[in-house]
Amino acid sequence: MKLGWIEVAALAAASVVSAKDDLAYSPPFYPSPWADGQGEWAEVYKRAVDIVSQMTLTEKVNLTTGTGWQLERCVGQTGSVPRLNIPSLCLQDSPLGIRFSDYNSAFPAGVNVAATWDKTLAYLRGQAMGEEFSDKGIDVQLGPAAGPLGAHPDGGRNWEGFSPDPALTGVLFAETIKGIQDAGVIATAKHYIMNEQEHFRQQPEAAGYGFNVSDSLSSNVDDKTMHELYLWPFADAVRAGVGAVMCSYNQINNSYGCENSETLNKLLKAELGFQGFVMSDWTAHHSGVGAALAGLDMSMPGDVTFDSGTSFWGANLTVGVLNGTIPQWRVDDMAVRIMAAYYKVGRDTKYTPPNFSSWTRDEYGFAHNHVSEGAYERVNEFVDVQRDHADLIRRIGAQSTVLLKNKGALPLSRKEKLVALLGEDAGSNSWGANGCDDRGCDNGTLAMAWGSGTANFPYLVTPEQAIQNEVLQGRGNVFAVTDSWALDKIAAAARQASVSLVFVNSDSGEGYLSVDGNEGDRNNITLWKNGDNVVKTAANNCNNTVVIIHSVGPVLIDEWYDHPNVTGILWAGLPGQESGNSIADVLYGRVNPGAKSPFTWGKTRESYGSPLVKDANNGNGAPQSDFTQGVFIDYRHFDKFNETPIYEFGYGLSYTTFELSDLHVQPLNASRYTPTSGMTEAAKNFGEIGDASEYVYPEGLERIHEFIYPWINSTDLKASSDDSNYGWEDSKYIPEGATDGSAQPRLPASGGAGGNPGLYEDLFRVSVKVKNTGNVAGDEVPQLYVSLGGPNEPKVVLRKFERIHLAPSQEAVWTTTLTRRDLANWDVSAQDWTVTPYPKTIYVGNSSRKLPLQASLPKAQ
């Protein structure tokens, strides 16, 4: 059949992906599975089919394609279907609040949510964000993130996600999604998948940094590691009913993430049973037909490059369907998936047009900002959507603060005669809290890292402000030195202080911004802004020095953590707008710290393994990142190589003490696991496709410059394609089976949301007594780890946890269950999960290396 030039581009990446035999290869999987409305999607699927059946081809295409960068109010907007009262969908960053807006909250980052180990707080944060997005007229929140997972401790965007542990991430990822969608907004699980570093994630971005590479980095991963580590939290997201998944910039095994048929068609749609829609990351769309057949459902922001006025889809998708290159059922499936997600969250009952503009804070402006066209209208209504969310933000900030060391220094009493506040991180950014675009600097206290995963602060309470308020209420004295290079002034203040509170940080972010020479990823994992010298100077002059770390992840503290005058260390992460109040609540004992570290604190960067790829290592070809570490990242790596961390994964102190006892295991009457078999139904067409004359630009339409439309210029499809190569035969670019709409075999590991339903069947019930043995109320997090027993398996892997609040001397019984999935490994040969015959042992404790309770499990099927 025939297609336009734009569709041909990069088609080879959809099937045969490696020009060199020695490079990783992503096997093809076709056709793209069509939604079937399984499980809780049944009702909304029927509604979606009904409405899509009434649409014309161009109306369907309009749903799939963004209108172009900066051409509507949101960072991404689809076309609309006015005839059927379907509005343009507004898609907006970020995972921690509304980007490019005003009168919105700036929530703690995902890494802080991970540190709470609190499912309820994850849900409440998601719900609060969803409420704000909805109130601003946003239909799709571009978050939360579980990619990157955190294979590299210095990866630039780890903080947007949760933890390098897939189970901890998966649970909190799912709870966040539920919260967002219960508020009536479609959540987006991103960045799918293996988007583990910023260097080379986009070829044009790499070129801007002086690298001569032809393609984006390829994350090369084996099947077992993919399933047991990186895909794990996305299975939880699908099981939670997520409406959208965003495919990533990078390649996976040398096939781009947004046209990788293995990851989109096979893993996400066929195996995990994802019923929602896949959108591209912004300009991560590299081909027309190739991406469509490989499982992409929505192109964002619609144009090939920002403001190019050209699109892989839009009119080109219309041409592809009309000339038979793309089967009708594929574009119908795209539209059904989008509408099903829209109905699933009840967006049709909560819809309101966007009441803000991403591109200006002025009240009035052009409807189409970038080209200064359309009506000159009110584009910002300044709607305050914050509600009472500041209280929740403050609570999460405090409950995510990890107490790493306490030699009697904390909590403070307000009776300290003189408090010294030391370090730039205690103070404010002299340019203002939002003084750097997308937070692309490290000035003052760090409460949010940089990139598109940010939001504007409505205000930012600094540690200096909050702690000074505490001290003055106690009629004490406070000196602040917030110049981290003024070591003589820091020493002088520390010598006089009853307690020195030292604030230090380490920042990172997205690769399009470079901060102090850090191109998204961190150059190292040391403290920024002379932090180590600030700590040592204070500790050498004050015998009661407490260090507070605001960071995106682990930092090296080996130089000073065991200094005798360092009496306390706290990690406060990226706590958002209430930063100062949150840390003051912990320092002064209003909140008893109960957080646990969501990552390992190593003595050196080398102790983590998993180095970033920072140099072009494949000539001018795509840089290759080989994930040869397999499942051994973070604490799993430390355990395997007998590396002793400073503070282990799951570690965190309290102002009280706890005791765990009485571990009991009860086998449950579970059925035998049955691999899924049989066939799907055949693909269906919804509605009729007319001839080309029905899809030509309407007469009298006043076109907006660079706007992406679904209509074609002419009934002559070759002319509409503007392609000298129009007329290629299918065999040259269409992968085998890619257009086959007949019934397809079901995968053994498929069958329900998140995979085979048998994976989620409970095999054992486990109970443990938890007692507060101290004198103050506090929170403990019992953690259950499993040894899977095999010779090449991690020593232990986290599977269950719960944050429990207990009064002094109070005792509670924590009960949980272990599913088949919790005990299974991925069998590469069978392409299914299996509980191996190796002995299984469970361990319960309060960190990955403090596991006093253990029990062997009976053999399970």
Curated annotation (Swiss-Prot):
Its UniProt entry gives the catalysed reaction(s) as: Hydrolysis of terminal, non-reducing beta-D-glucosyl residues with release of beta-D-glucose
* GO BP terms, alphabetized: carbohydrate catabolic process; cellulose catabolic process
A single GO molecular-function term is:
beta-glucosidase activity
Q: In which pathway does it act?
A: Glycan metabolism; cellulose degradation
Keyword list, A-Z: Carbohydrate metabolism, Cellulose degradation, Glycoprotein, Glycosidase, Hydrolase, Polysaccharide degradation, Secreted, Signal
Q: Can the keyword Signal be found in this entry's annotation? A: yes
State the compartments where it is located. Secreted
Pfam families named in the record: Fn3-like (PF14310), Glyco_hydro_3 (PF00933), Glyco_hydro_3_C (PF01915)
Name the segments for region: Disordered: 730-754
Active site as annotated: 281
Q: What is its EC number?
A: 3.2.1.21
The record's Gene Ontology cellular component field reads:
extracellular region
Show which residues constitute the signal peptide. Answer: 1-19
- Glycosylated residues are 62, 212, 253, 316, 323, 355, 443, 524, 543, 565, 669, 713, 846
Family that this chain belongs to: Belongs to the glycosyl hydrolase 3 family.
Q: What does this protein do?
A: Beta-glucosidases are one of a number of cellulolytic enzymes involved in the degradation of cellulosic biomass. Catalyzes the last step releasing glucose from the inhibitory cellobiose.
Q: Supply the name of the protein.
A: Probable beta-glucosidase A
Q: Which gene encodes it?
A: bglA
